[in-house]
From Swiss-Prot:
It comes from Xenopus tropicalis (Western clawed frog). GO terms for cellular component: centriolar satellite; centrosome; ciliary membrane; cilium; cytoplasm; pericentriolar material. It is found in: Cytoplasm, Cytoskeleton, Microtubule organizing center, Centrosome; Cytoplasm, Cytoskeleton; Cell projection, Cilium membrane; Cytoplasm, Cytoskeleton, Microtubule organizing center, Centrosome, Centriolar satellite. Pfam families: TPR_16, TPR_19, TPR_8. The keyword Ribosomal protein does not apply. TPR repeats lie at residues 64-97, 98-131, 133-165, 166-198, 200-232, 234-266, 267-300, 302-334, 336-368, 370-402. May be required for the dynein-mediated transport of pericentriolar proteins to the centrosome. Required for microtubule anchoring at the centrosome but not for microtubule nucleation. Required for ciliogenesis. Gene3D superfamilies: Tetratricopeptide repeat domain. InterPro entries: TPR-like_helical_dom_sf (IPR011990), TPR_rpt (IPR019734). The keyword Repeat applies. Part of BBSome complex. This is BBSome complex member BBS4.
Length: 516
Protein backbone atom coordinates (compact mmCIF):
# COMPACT_ATOMS: atom_id res chain seq x y z
CA UNK A 1 0.00 0.00 0.00
CA UNK A 2 2.83 2.37 0.82
CA UNK A 3 4.41 1.80 -2.57
CA UNK A 4 1.12 2.55 -4.35
CA UNK A 5 0.79 5.84 -2.43
CA UNK A 6 4.35 6.79 -3.33
CA UNK A 7 3.58 6.22 -7.01
CA UNK A 8 0.47 8.38 -6.92
CA UNK A 9 2.13 11.47 -5.44
CA UNK A 10 4.52 12.13 -8.34
CA UNK A 11 1.61 11.90 -10.78
CA UNK A 12 -0.32 14.67 -8.93
CA UNK A 13 2.69 16.96 -8.80
CA UNK A 14 3.17 16.45 -12.52
CA UNK A 15 -0.40 17.54 -13.14
CA UNK A 16 0.18 20.71 -11.11
CA UNK A 17 3.24 21.56 -13.17
CA UNK A 18 1.33 21.14 -16.41
CA UNK A 19 -1.46 23.48 -15.21
CA UNK A 20 0.91 26.33 -14.28
CA UNK A 21 1.38 28.36 -17.51
CA UNK A 22 3.50 31.41 -18.05
CA UNK A 23 1.72 34.74 -18.83
CA UNK A 24 2.06 35.39 -22.56
CA UNK A 25 4.43 38.18 -23.48
CA UNK A 26 2.90 41.15 -25.27
CA UNK A 27 4.67 42.55 -28.31
CA UNK A 28 7.21 45.17 -27.29
CA UNK A 29 5.48 47.88 -29.33
CA UNK A 30 2.24 47.65 -27.36
CA UNK A 31 3.43 46.48 -23.97
CA UNK A 32 2.54 49.67 -22.08
CA UNK A 33 -0.45 50.84 -24.14
CA UNK A 34 -2.90 49.83 -21.42
CA UNK A 35 -0.98 51.85 -18.83
CA UNK A 36 -0.79 54.88 -21.14
CA UNK A 37 -4.54 54.70 -21.71
CA UNK A 38 -5.22 54.34 -17.98
CA UNK A 39 -3.23 57.45 -17.07
CA UNK A 40 -4.75 59.45 -19.95
CA UNK A 41 -8.39 58.76 -19.09
CA UNK A 42 -7.62 59.61 -15.46
CA UNK A 43 -6.11 62.93 -16.68
CA UNK A 44 -2.84 62.09 -14.94
CA UNK A 45 -0.88 63.62 -17.77
CA UNK A 46 2.51 63.80 -16.04
CA UNK A 47 2.54 60.08 -15.30
CA UNK A 48 1.20 59.43 -18.78
CA UNK A 49 4.03 61.39 -20.39
CA UNK A 50 6.58 59.51 -18.28
CA UNK A 51 5.26 56.13 -19.45
CA UNK A 52 5.12 57.39 -23.04
CA UNK A 53 8.76 58.43 -22.83
CA UNK A 54 9.78 54.98 -21.61
CA UNK A 55 7.71 53.28 -24.30
CA UNK A 56 9.17 55.39 -27.08
CA UNK A 57 12.71 54.75 -25.87
CA UNK A 58 12.05 51.01 -25.81
CA UNK A 59 10.46 50.98 -29.28
CA UNK A 60 12.82 53.40 -31.03
CA UNK A 61 9.93 55.90 -31.35
CA UNK A 62 7.69 53.75 -33.56
CA UNK A 63 4.88 53.00 -31.09
CA UNK A 64 1.85 54.52 -32.82
CA UNK A 65 -0.42 54.66 -29.77
CA UNK A 66 2.21 56.33 -27.58
CA UNK A 67 2.83 59.00 -30.21
CA UNK A 68 -0.94 59.46 -30.68
CA UNK A 69 -1.63 60.04 -26.98
CA UNK A 70 1.39 62.33 -26.66
CA UNK A 71 -0.03 64.45 -29.49
CA UNK A 72 -3.41 64.62 -27.73
CA UNK A 73 -1.73 65.83 -24.53
CA UNK A 74 0.23 68.49 -26.43
CA UNK A 75 -3.00 69.73 -28.01
CA UNK A 76 -4.62 69.99 -24.59
CA UNK A 77 -1.63 72.06 -23.47
CA UNK A 78 -2.15 74.44 -26.39
CA UNK A 79 0.86 73.26 -28.40
CA UNK A 80 -1.06 72.80 -31.63
CA UNK A 81 1.91 72.86 -34.01
CA UNK A 82 3.80 70.21 -32.02
CA UNK A 83 0.69 68.03 -31.87
CA UNK A 84 0.26 68.38 -35.64
CA UNK A 85 3.76 67.08 -36.25
CA UNK A 86 3.16 64.07 -34.00
CA UNK A 87 -0.17 63.26 -35.66
CA UNK A 88 1.59 63.40 -39.01
CA UNK A 89 4.07 60.89 -37.60
CA UNK A 90 1.16 58.63 -36.67
CA UNK A 91 -0.18 58.94 -40.22
CA UNK A 92 3.22 57.83 -41.55
CA UNK A 93 3.35 54.87 -39.14
CA UNK A 94 -0.18 53.79 -40.10
CA UNK A 95 -1.25 55.36 -43.41
CA UNK A 96 -4.47 53.30 -43.61
CA UNK A 97 -5.96 54.78 -40.42
CA UNK A 98 -8.61 57.44 -41.01
CA UNK A 99 -8.43 58.42 -37.31
CA UNK A 100 -4.85 59.65 -37.72
CA UNK A 101 -5.82 61.78 -40.71
CA UNK A 102 -8.81 63.17 -38.82
CA UNK A 103 -6.51 64.32 -36.04
CA UNK A 104 -4.12 65.90 -38.56
CA UNK A 105 -7.05 67.79 -40.10
CA UNK A 106 -8.30 68.78 -36.66
CA UNK A 107 -4.95 70.34 -35.78
CA UNK A 108 -4.88 72.17 -39.12
CA UNK A 109 -8.38 73.47 -38.39
CA UNK A 110 -7.31 74.77 -34.98
CA UNK A 111 -4.37 76.52 -36.65
CA UNK A 112 -6.81 78.30 -38.98
CA UNK A 113 -5.65 76.41 -42.09
CA UNK A 114 -9.13 75.50 -43.26
CA UNK A 115 -8.27 74.72 -46.89
CA UNK A 116 -5.53 72.32 -45.84
CA UNK A 117 -7.92 70.76 -43.32
CA UNK A 118 -10.48 70.20 -46.09
CA UNK A 119 -7.89 68.37 -48.19
CA UNK A 120 -6.91 66.07 -45.32
CA UNK A 121 -10.56 65.41 -44.39
CA UNK A 122 -11.29 64.46 -48.02
CA UNK A 123 -8.37 62.03 -47.91
CA UNK A 124 -9.74 60.56 -44.68
CA UNK A 125 -13.18 60.27 -46.30
CA UNK A 126 -11.71 58.10 -49.04
CA UNK A 127 -10.48 55.69 -46.35
CA UNK A 128 -13.79 55.70 -44.46
CA UNK A 129 -16.86 56.83 -46.38
CA UNK A 130 -19.34 56.14 -43.59
CA UNK A 131 -17.83 58.34 -40.87
CA UNK A 132 -20.30 61.10 -40.02
CA UNK A 133 -17.67 63.05 -38.08
CA UNK A 134 -15.64 63.56 -41.25
CA UNK A 135 -18.69 64.94 -43.08
CA UNK A 136 -19.60 67.16 -40.13
CA UNK A 137 -16.10 68.61 -39.83
CA UNK A 138 -15.94 69.17 -43.58
CA UNK A 139 -19.18 71.14 -43.26
CA UNK A 140 -17.69 73.26 -40.48
CA UNK A 141 -14.54 73.92 -42.52
CA UNK A 142 -16.60 74.99 -45.54
CA UNK A 143 -18.59 77.23 -43.21
CA UNK A 144 -15.41 79.03 -42.18
CA UNK A 145 -14.47 79.28 -45.86
CA UNK A 146 -17.89 80.96 -46.51
CA UNK A 147 -18.93 78.17 -48.91
CA UNK A 148 -22.41 77.69 -47.47
CA UNK A 149 -23.72 75.40 -50.20
CA UNK A 150 -20.97 72.81 -49.73
CA UNK A 151 -21.25 73.21 -45.97
CA UNK A 152 -24.97 72.38 -46.05
CA UNK A 153 -24.30 69.45 -48.38
CA UNK A 154 -21.74 67.89 -46.02
CA UNK A 155 -23.86 68.50 -42.92
CA UNK A 156 -26.89 66.92 -44.59
CA UNK A 157 -24.74 63.90 -45.50
CA UNK A 158 -23.57 63.68 -41.88
CA UNK A 159 -27.20 63.58 -40.73
CA UNK A 160 -27.97 60.86 -43.25
CA UNK A 161 -25.09 58.75 -41.95
CA UNK A 162 -25.93 59.31 -38.29
CA UNK A 163 -28.77 61.31 -36.76
CA UNK A 164 -27.31 63.57 -34.09
CA UNK A 165 -27.99 67.09 -32.85
CA UNK A 166 -24.53 68.58 -33.49
CA UNK A 167 -24.80 68.63 -37.29
CA UNK A 168 -28.45 69.68 -37.11
CA UNK A 169 -27.59 72.68 -34.92
CA UNK A 170 -24.82 73.78 -37.28
CA UNK A 171 -27.12 73.36 -40.29
CA UNK A 172 -29.79 75.45 -38.58
CA UNK A 173 -27.30 78.24 -37.95
CA UNK A 174 -26.36 78.28 -41.63
CA UNK A 175 -30.04 78.63 -42.51
CA UNK A 176 -30.24 81.57 -40.11
CA UNK A 177 -27.31 83.20 -41.91
CA UNK A 178 -29.21 82.82 -45.17
CA UNK A 179 -32.34 84.32 -43.61
CA UNK A 180 -34.36 81.10 -43.80
CA UNK A 181 -35.94 81.37 -40.35
CA UNK A 182 -38.72 78.85 -41.04
CA UNK A 183 -36.20 76.29 -42.29
CA UNK A 184 -34.02 76.91 -39.25
CA UNK A 185 -36.97 76.37 -36.92
CA UNK A 186 -37.76 73.08 -38.66
CA UNK A 187 -34.13 71.93 -38.42
CA UNK A 188 -33.84 72.89 -34.75
CA UNK A 189 -37.12 71.11 -34.01
CA UNK A 190 -35.80 67.92 -35.60
CA UNK A 191 -32.60 68.27 -33.58
CA UNK A 192 -34.67 68.71 -30.43
CA UNK A 193 -36.28 65.33 -31.04
CA UNK A 194 -32.80 63.79 -30.88
CA UNK A 195 -31.81 65.77 -27.79
CA UNK A 196 -34.98 66.87 -25.96
CA UNK A 197 -33.11 68.25 -22.94
CA UNK A 198 -30.68 70.42 -24.90
CA UNK A 199 -31.11 73.86 -23.32
CA UNK A 200 -29.28 75.57 -26.17
CA UNK A 201 -31.81 74.23 -28.67
CA UNK A 202 -34.76 75.12 -26.44
CA UNK A 203 -33.48 78.66 -25.94
CA UNK A 204 -32.74 79.14 -29.63
CA UNK A 205 -36.21 77.96 -30.65
CA UNK A 206 -37.74 80.23 -28.03
CA UNK A 207 -35.88 83.21 -29.44
CA UNK A 208 -36.88 82.37 -33.01
CA UNK A 209 -40.55 82.10 -32.07
CA UNK A 210 -40.19 85.35 -30.14
CA UNK A 211 -38.79 86.97 -33.27
CA UNK A 212 -41.77 85.74 -35.29
CA UNK A 213 -44.18 87.13 -32.70
CA UNK A 214 -45.38 83.72 -31.47
CA UNK A 215 -45.11 84.58 -27.80
CA UNK A 216 -46.96 81.51 -26.50
CA UNK A 217 -44.58 79.07 -28.18
CA UNK A 218 -41.60 81.21 -27.25
CA UNK A 219 -42.61 81.20 -23.61
CA UNK A 220 -43.14 77.41 -23.74
CA UNK A 221 -39.66 76.67 -25.08
CA UNK A 222 -37.94 79.18 -22.83
CA UNK A 223 -39.80 77.77 -19.83
CA UNK A 224 -38.61 74.26 -20.69
CA UNK A 225 -35.05 75.52 -21.03
CA UNK A 226 -35.20 77.10 -17.57
CA UNK A 227 -36.76 73.93 -16.16
CA UNK A 228 -33.77 71.86 -17.24
CA UNK A 229 -31.25 74.58 -16.36
CA UNK A 230 -32.55 77.32 -14.00
CA UNK A 231 -29.28 79.24 -14.37
CA UNK A 232 -29.41 79.29 -18.19
CA UNK A 233 -28.19 82.79 -18.96
CA UNK A 234 -29.74 83.17 -22.41
CA UNK A 235 -33.03 81.69 -21.29
CA UNK A 236 -33.27 84.08 -18.35
CA UNK A 237 -32.50 87.08 -20.55
CA UNK A 238 -35.04 86.00 -23.17
CA UNK A 239 -37.78 85.42 -20.60
CA UNK A 240 -36.99 88.74 -18.93
CA UNK A 241 -37.05 90.48 -22.28
CA UNK A 242 -40.54 89.12 -23.02
CA UNK A 243 -41.79 90.43 -19.69
CA UNK A 244 -40.00 93.71 -20.28
CA UNK A 245 -41.64 94.13 -23.69
CA UNK A 246 -45.06 93.76 -22.05
CA UNK A 247 -44.28 96.35 -19.38
CA UNK A 248 -43.69 93.93 -16.49
CA UNK A 249 -40.50 95.69 -15.44
CA UNK A 250 -40.45 94.47 -11.84
CA UNK A 251 -40.82 90.82 -12.88
CA UNK A 252 -38.15 91.28 -15.55
CA UNK A 253 -35.80 92.81 -12.99
CA UNK A 254 -36.31 89.82 -10.71
CA UNK A 255 -35.26 87.55 -13.59
CA UNK A 256 -32.23 89.69 -14.36
CA UNK A 257 -31.22 89.58 -10.70
CA UNK A 258 -30.84 85.80 -11.00
CA UNK A 259 -28.72 86.16 -14.13
CA UNK A 260 -26.56 88.87 -12.55
CA UNK A 261 -25.40 86.46 -9.86
CA UNK A 262 -23.91 84.12 -12.48
CA UNK A 263 -22.79 86.55 -15.20
CA UNK A 264 -22.20 89.93 -13.52
CA UNK A 265 -20.00 91.13 -16.38
CA UNK A 266 -22.61 90.78 -19.12
CA UNK A 267 -23.11 93.94 -21.13
CA UNK A 268 -26.52 92.88 -22.56
CA UNK A 269 -27.73 92.10 -19.05
CA UNK A 270 -26.91 95.57 -17.72
CA UNK A 271 -28.33 97.11 -20.86
CA UNK A 272 -31.64 95.35 -20.27
CA UNK A 273 -31.63 96.33 -16.59
CA UNK A 274 -31.03 99.92 -17.59
CA UNK A 275 -33.96 99.89 -20.00
CA UNK A 276 -36.18 98.42 -17.27
CA UNK A 277 -35.35 101.43 -15.12
CA UNK A 278 -36.00 103.62 -18.15
CA UNK A 279 -39.45 102.07 -18.48
CA UNK A 280 -40.05 102.82 -14.79
CA UNK A 281 -38.92 106.42 -15.50
CA UNK A 282 -35.94 106.09 -13.15
CA UNK A 283 -33.58 107.80 -15.55
CA UNK A 284 -30.58 108.23 -13.25
CA UNK A 285 -30.55 104.53 -12.41
CA UNK A 286 -31.00 103.74 -16.11
CA UNK A 287 -27.98 105.85 -17.06
CA UNK A 288 -25.89 104.22 -14.34
CA UNK A 289 -26.69 100.71 -15.61
CA UNK A 290 -26.24 101.67 -19.25
CA UNK A 291 -22.85 103.22 -18.58
CA UNK A 292 -21.79 100.01 -16.86
CA UNK A 293 -22.92 98.13 -19.96
CA UNK A 294 -20.94 100.56 -22.10
CA UNK A 295 -17.85 99.99 -19.95
CA UNK A 296 -18.18 96.23 -20.48
CA UNK A 297 -18.84 96.60 -24.21
CA UNK A 298 -17.61 99.98 -25.46
CA UNK A 299 -18.32 99.24 -29.14
CA UNK A 300 -21.94 98.11 -28.77
CA UNK A 301 -23.95 100.69 -30.68
CA UNK A 302 -27.19 99.58 -29.02
CA UNK A 303 -25.96 100.65 -25.60
CA UNK A 304 -24.92 104.01 -27.05
CA UNK A 305 -28.32 104.31 -28.69
CA UNK A 306 -30.15 103.67 -25.42
CA UNK A 307 -27.93 106.17 -23.61
CA UNK A 308 -28.85 108.77 -26.21
CA UNK A 309 -32.51 107.88 -25.77
CA UNK A 310 -32.41 108.30 -21.99
CA UNK A 311 -30.54 111.60 -22.22
CA UNK A 312 -33.16 112.85 -24.67
CA UNK A 313 -35.86 112.00 -22.15
CA UNK A 314 -33.93 113.96 -19.51
CA UNK A 315 -33.65 116.90 -21.94
CA UNK A 316 -29.85 116.65 -21.91
CA UNK A 317 -29.55 117.17 -25.64
CA UNK A 318 -25.81 117.73 -25.93
CA UNK A 319 -25.11 114.45 -24.13
CA UNK A 320 -27.71 112.72 -26.29
CA UNK A 321 -26.02 114.08 -29.41
CA UNK A 322 -22.67 112.76 -28.15
CA UNK A 323 -23.90 109.19 -27.63
CA UNK A 324 -26.02 109.07 -30.78
CA UNK A 325 -23.14 110.31 -32.94
CA UNK A 326 -20.91 107.62 -31.47
CA UNK A 327 -23.57 105.00 -32.21
CA UNK A 328 -23.89 106.16 -35.82
CA UNK A 329 -20.13 105.97 -36.29
CA UNK A 330 -20.32 102.30 -35.28
CA UNK A 331 -23.54 101.41 -37.12
CA UNK A 332 -24.70 103.36 -40.16
CA UNK A 333 -27.77 101.39 -41.18
CA UNK A 334 -30.28 102.09 -38.41
CA UNK A 335 -32.94 104.67 -39.20
CA UNK A 336 -33.82 105.15 -35.53
CA UNK A 337 -30.35 106.47 -34.80
CA UNK A 338 -30.66 109.21 -37.40
CA UNK A 339 -34.17 110.06 -36.23
CA UNK A 340 -33.09 110.52 -32.61
CA UNK A 341 -30.05 112.46 -33.77
CA UNK A 342 -32.38 114.75 -35.68
CA UNK A 343 -34.40 115.33 -32.51
CA UNK A 344 -31.28 116.24 -30.57
CA UNK A 345 -30.15 118.58 -33.36
CA UNK A 346 -33.59 120.21 -33.38
CA UNK A 347 -33.30 121.07 -29.70
CA UNK A 348 -29.75 122.30 -30.30
CA UNK A 349 -31.15 124.69 -32.98
CA UNK A 350 -29.23 123.02 -35.82
CA UNK A 351 -32.20 122.81 -38.16
CA UNK A 352 -30.38 122.10 -41.42
CA UNK A 353 -28.51 119.11 -40.05
CA UNK A 354 -31.71 117.93 -38.38
CA UNK A 355 -33.44 117.93 -41.77
CA UNK A 356 -30.55 115.98 -43.28
CA UNK A 357 -30.79 113.41 -40.50
CA UNK A 358 -34.53 113.01 -41.03
CA UNK A 359 -33.98 112.51 -44.76
CA UNK A 360 -31.35 109.88 -44.06
CA UNK A 361 -33.68 108.10 -41.62
CA UNK A 362 -36.52 108.13 -44.15
CA UNK A 363 -34.27 106.64 -46.84
CA UNK A 364 -33.13 103.83 -44.52
CA UNK A 365 -36.58 102.83 -43.27
CA UNK A 366 -39.45 102.85 -45.75
CA UNK A 367 -42.02 101.51 -43.26
CA UNK A 368 -41.70 103.59 -40.07
CA UNK A 369 -44.34 106.36 -40.02
CA UNK A 370 -42.77 107.97 -36.96
CA UNK A 371 -39.87 109.31 -39.03
CA UNK A 372 -42.23 111.15 -41.36
CA UNK A 373 -44.35 112.36 -38.45
CA UNK A 374 -41.46 113.99 -36.64
CA UNK A 375 -40.02 115.34 -39.87
CA UNK A 376 -43.41 116.87 -40.68
CA UNK A 377 -43.62 118.44 -37.22
CA UNK A 378 -40.18 120.01 -37.70
CA UNK A 379 -41.06 121.39 -41.13
CA UNK A 380 -44.41 122.73 -39.88
CA UNK A 381 -42.78 124.51 -36.96
CA UNK A 382 -40.27 126.04 -39.38
CA UNK A 383 -43.10 127.38 -41.55
CA UNK A 384 -42.61 124.92 -44.43
CA UNK A 385 -46.22 123.84 -44.73
CA UNK A 386 -45.73 122.35 -48.19
CA UNK A 387 -42.89 120.12 -47.03
CA UNK A 388 -44.86 119.14 -43.93
CA UNK A 389 -47.81 118.20 -46.15
CA UNK A 390 -45.58 115.96 -48.26
CA UNK A 391 -44.26 114.16 -45.20
CA UNK A 392 -47.78 113.79 -43.84
CA UNK A 393 -48.96 112.19 -47.07
CA UNK A 394 -46.06 109.74 -46.84
CA UNK A 395 -47.14 109.10 -43.25
CA UNK A 396 -50.66 108.26 -44.46
CA UNK A 397 -49.27 105.80 -47.01
CA UNK A 398 -47.19 103.96 -44.40
CA UNK A 399 -50.05 103.89 -41.90
CA UNK A 400 -52.38 102.39 -44.52
CA UNK A 401 -49.81 99.67 -45.27
CA UNK A 402 -49.27 98.89 -41.59
CA UNK A 403 -53.00 98.88 -40.88
CA UNK A 404 -53.37 95.78 -43.06
CA UNK A 405 -51.13 93.86 -40.63
CA UNK A 406 -53.25 94.93 -37.61
CA UNK A 407 -50.36 96.87 -36.14
CA UNK A 408 -51.11 98.79 -32.96
CA UNK A 409 -49.77 102.31 -32.81
CA UNK A 410 -48.48 104.29 -29.87
CA UNK A 411 -51.28 106.51 -28.50
CA UNK A 412 -48.96 109.50 -28.24
CA UNK A 413 -47.94 109.12 -31.86
CA UNK A 414 -51.61 108.89 -32.88
CA UNK A 415 -52.43 112.03 -30.91
CA UNK A 416 -49.55 113.97 -32.46
CA UNK A 417 -50.51 112.85 -35.98
CA UNK A 418 -54.11 113.90 -35.44
CA UNK A 419 -53.02 117.32 -34.21
CA UNK A 420 -50.74 117.71 -37.22
CA UNK A 421 -53.48 116.60 -39.58
CA UNK A 422 -55.87 119.07 -38.01
CA UNK A 423 -53.32 121.86 -38.39
CA UNK A 424 -52.73 120.94 -42.04
CA UNK A 425 -56.48 120.30 -42.55
CA UNK A 426 -55.74 116.95 -44.25
CA UNK A 427 -56.11 114.41 -41.45
CA UNK A 428 -59.76 113.36 -41.83
CA UNK A 429 -59.00 110.37 -44.07
CA UNK A 430 -56.35 108.85 -41.81
CA UNK A 431 -57.74 105.85 -39.93
CA UNK A 432 -55.76 104.37 -37.05
CA UNK A 433 -56.11 100.92 -35.62
CA UNK A 434 -55.94 102.36 -32.13
CA UNK A 435 -57.72 105.61 -31.36
CA UNK A 436 -56.80 108.07 -28.65
CA UNK A 437 -58.76 108.28 -25.41
CA UNK A 438 -60.19 111.71 -26.22
CA UNK A 439 -61.62 111.66 -29.75
CA UNK A 440 -63.12 115.12 -29.21
CA UNK A 441 -59.65 116.59 -29.24
CA UNK A 442 -59.37 115.86 -32.91
CA UNK A 443 -62.71 117.52 -33.65
CA UNK A 444 -61.72 120.61 -31.70
CA UNK A 445 -58.36 120.73 -33.48
CA UNK A 446 -59.96 120.36 -36.88
CA UNK A 447 -62.20 123.33 -36.23
CA UNK A 448 -59.39 125.80 -35.80
CA UNK A 449 -59.39 128.77 -38.08
CA UNK A 450 -56.77 129.50 -40.71
CA UNK A 451 -55.09 132.00 -38.49
CA UNK A 452 -54.00 129.24 -36.11
CA UNK A 453 -52.32 127.08 -38.75
CA UNK A 454 -48.81 128.36 -38.15
CA UNK A 455 -48.86 127.98 -34.37
CA UNK A 456 -45.92 125.88 -33.13
CA UNK A 457 -47.00 122.25 -33.01
CA UNK A 458 -45.72 120.19 -30.11
CA UNK A 459 -43.56 121.39 -27.26
CA UNK A 460 -40.03 120.15 -26.72
CA UNK A 461 -41.24 117.67 -24.12
CA UNK A 462 -43.94 116.28 -26.39
CA UNK A 463 -41.50 115.81 -29.25
CA UNK A 464 -39.03 114.15 -26.91
CA UNK A 465 -41.66 111.70 -25.70
CA UNK A 466 -42.54 110.86 -29.27
CA UNK A 467 -38.93 109.98 -29.87
CA UNK A 468 -38.68 107.92 -26.73
CA UNK A 469 -41.50 105.71 -27.96
CA UNK A 470 -39.99 105.24 -31.40
CA UNK A 471 -40.97 101.57 -31.50
CA UNK A 472 -44.26 102.03 -29.71
CA UNK A 473 -46.36 100.96 -32.69
CA UNK A 474 -44.66 97.53 -32.72
CA UNK A 475 -45.12 95.03 -29.90
CA UNK A 476 -41.94 93.11 -30.72
CA UNK A 477 -38.99 94.28 -28.66
CA UNK A 478 -35.50 94.25 -30.09
CA UNK A 479 -33.11 91.49 -29.08
CA UNK A 480 -29.44 91.82 -29.81
CA UNK A 481 -26.07 90.35 -28.78
CA UNK A 482 -27.29 88.23 -25.95
CA UNK A 483 -30.91 89.43 -26.01
CA UNK A 484 -30.26 93.13 -25.44
CA UNK A 485 -33.50 95.07 -25.62
CA UNK A 486 -33.41 98.08 -27.90
CA UNK A 487 -36.28 100.52 -27.81
CA UNK A 488 -36.19 101.23 -31.54
CA UNK A 489 -35.37 97.84 -33.06
CA UNK A 490 -38.57 96.35 -34.41
CA UNK A 491 -37.28 93.00 -35.54
CA UNK A 492 -35.37 91.08 -32.85
CA UNK A 493 -32.46 89.02 -34.05
CA UNK A 494 -31.20 85.79 -32.67
CA UNK A 495 -28.09 86.17 -30.53
CA UNK A 496 -25.72 83.70 -31.68
CA UNK A 497 -22.18 84.49 -30.69
CA UNK A 498 -19.04 82.35 -31.63
CA UNK A 499 -18.34 79.74 -28.95
CA UNK A 500 -15.98 76.85 -28.35
CA UNK A 501 -18.15 74.02 -27.05
CA UNK A 502 -16.46 71.01 -25.53
CA UNK A 503 -16.33 68.39 -28.24
CA UNK A 504 -14.44 65.17 -28.83
CA UNK A 505 -10.88 65.41 -29.98
CA UNK A 506 -11.81 64.41 -33.51
CA UNK A 507 -14.73 66.80 -33.95
CA UNK A 508 -14.28 70.40 -35.02
CA UNK A 509 -16.24 72.99 -33.01
CA UNK A 510 -19.49 74.30 -34.38
CA UNK A 511 -19.68 77.87 -35.56
CA UNK A 512 -22.10 80.40 -34.32
CA UNK A 513 -22.94 83.47 -36.18
CA UNK A 514 -22.39 86.70 -34.48
CA UNK A 515 -25.56 88.73 -34.33
CA UNK A 516 -26.08 92.07 -36.16
Amino acid sequence: MAEEQQEVVPQESGLRKSRVQKVPELPILERRNWLIHLHYVRKDYESCKAVIKEQLQATQGVCEYAVYVQALILRLEGKIQESLELFQTCAVLNPTSSDNLKQVARSLFLLGKHKAAVEVYNEAARLNQKDWEICHNLGVCYLFLKDLSKSKEQLTLALQLHRQDLSAITLGKIQLQEGDIDGAIQTFTQALQLSPENTELLTTLGLLYLQNGLFQKAFEYLGNALTYDPSNYKGILAAGCMMQSHGDYDVALSKYRVAASSVPESSPLWNNIGMCFYGKKKYVAAISCLKRALYLSPFDWRVLYNLGLVHLSMQQYASAFHFLSAAISLHHGNAGLYMLLAVALTYLDDIENAKSSYQQAASLDQTDPLVNLNFAVLLYNQGDKKGALGQYQELERKVSALRETSTEFDPEMVDMAQKLGAALQVGESLVWTRQTKDPKGKQRGAGKGPGAEQAPLGSNQALGRAMSSAAGYSKASGLSSGITISTVSKHPSLPLEPEDPSLTSSTAPDYRRGHS
